[in-house]
């Protein structure tokens, strides 16, 4: 029976009960914080690294935008852990689902727009018309900028989904090729295994980079509206 490479992206079921929600909540359960307990060196190093990254990403925000730091940090951790846990064998990658990524992108994008319209409506509306636009082109520029604005959450969700899905499909194809070559071509199987090892390292980097890019774009949208 031929294996479908896209079966790994289907929602897992247990006794005909979808367990996708449970897999999405696993990264949240891994984030445990108890101020009464002192962390070890690893947790201290991770906390310091996370604080350094978030401070560098949000240092250009206004004081009102700094209030988003906790939400953005939680979002970064959730996407990062979902991407990394999805690299484990026999696991479900929740960030490979466009529905989940859009469920994260659309509310956050809408929140930045609402924040800008309530606090700086004139500046927010001014983004619809670039400065110095010729008078005859003003209606077309407004339409183009509006479409560009509406495409932002779609770009956020599709970018994350496409990168995670492409990486998993490539790993599936290389690992299947390695398995098929083990009994017939040992040399080729070793070469493809080395390729798979390098690909796993690349996917670890992609998992971290995509979480960083997703949150960074939200911060840039927030910076425009605060």
Swiss-Prot record:
**UniProt cross-references to CDD domains, sorted A to Z:** ATP-synt_Fo_a_6 (cd00310)
Predominant place of localization = mitochondrion
Q: Does the keyword Ubl conjugation belong to this entry?
A: no
Q: List GO BP terms, alphabetically.
A: proton motive force-driven ATP synthesis; proton transmembrane transport
GO CC aspect terms: mitochondrial inner membrane; proton-transporting ATP synthase complex
Tell me what topology the record assigns in the membrane.
Multi-pass membrane protein
Q: Which UniProt keywords apply?
A: ATP synthesis, CF(0), Hydrogen ion transport, Ion transport, Membrane, Mitochondrion, Mitochondrion inner membrane, Transmembrane, Transmembrane helix, Transport
What would you give as a GO molecular function for this chain, any one? proton channel activity
Against Pfam families, the record matches this protein to: ATP-synt_A (PF00119)
Q: Which reaction does it catalyse?
A: H(+)(in) = H(+)(out)
Q: Which residues cross the membrane?
A: 11-31, 37-54, 72-92, 98-118, 138-158, 178-198, 199-219
Where is this protein localized, as stated in its record? Answer: Mitochondrion inner membrane
What binding partners and quaternary form does the record give?
Component of the ATP synthase complex composed at least of ATP5F1A/subunit alpha, ATP5F1B/subunit beta, ATP5MC1/subunit c (homooctomer), MT-ATP6/subunit a, MT-ATP8/subunit 8, ATP5ME/subunit e, ATP5MF/subunit f, ATP5MG/subunit g, ATP5MK/subunit k, ATP5MJ/subunit j, ATP5F1C/subunit gamma, ATP5F1D/subunit delta, ATP5F1E/subunit epsilon, ATP5PF/subunit F6, ATP5PB/subunit b, ATP5PD/subunit d, ATP5PO/subunit OSCP.
Similarity comment text for this entry: Belongs to the ATPase A chain family.
Described function:
Subunit a, of the mitochondrial membrane ATP synthase complex (F(1)F(0) ATP synthase or Complex V) that produces ATP from ADP in the presence of a proton gradient across the membrane which is generated by electron transport complexes of the respiratory chain. ATP synthase complex consist of a soluble F(1) head domain - the catalytic core - and a membrane F(1) domain - the membrane proton channel. These two domains are linked by a central stalk rotating inside the F(1) region and a stationary peripheral stalk.
The record's listing under NCBIfam families reads: ATP_synt_6_or_A
Q: What is this protein called?
A: ATP synthase F(0) complex subunit a
């Amino acid at each position: 029976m031929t294996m479908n490479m896209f079966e790994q992206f289907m929602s897992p079921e247990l006794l005909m009960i979808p367990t996708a929600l449970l897999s999405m909540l696993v990264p949240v359960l891994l984030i445990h914080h108890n101020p009464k307990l002192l962390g070890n060196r690893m947790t201290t190093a991770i906390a310091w690294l996370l604080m350094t990254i978030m401070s560098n990403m949000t240092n250009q925000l206004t004081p009102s935008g700094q209030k988003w730091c906790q939400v953005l940090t939680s979002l970064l951790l959730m996407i990062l852990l979902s991407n990394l846990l999805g690299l484990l064998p026999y696991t479900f990658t929740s960030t490979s689902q466009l529905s989940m990524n859009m469920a994260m992108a659309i509310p956050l994008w809408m929140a930045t727009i609402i924040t800008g319209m309530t606090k700086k409506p004139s500046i927010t509306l001014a983004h619809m018309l670039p400065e110095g636009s010729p008078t005859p082109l003003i209606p077309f520029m407004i339409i183009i900028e509006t479409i560009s604005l509406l495409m932002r959450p779609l770009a956020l969700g599709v970018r994350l989904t496409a990168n995670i899905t492409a990486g998993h499909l490539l790993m599936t194809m290389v690992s299947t090729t390695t398995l098929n070559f083990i009994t017939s071509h040992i040399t080729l199987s070793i070469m493809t295994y080395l390729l798979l090892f390098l690909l796993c390292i690349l996917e670890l980097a992609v998992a971290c980079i995509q979480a960083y890019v997703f949150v960074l774009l939200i911060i840039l949208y927030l910076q425009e509206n605060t």
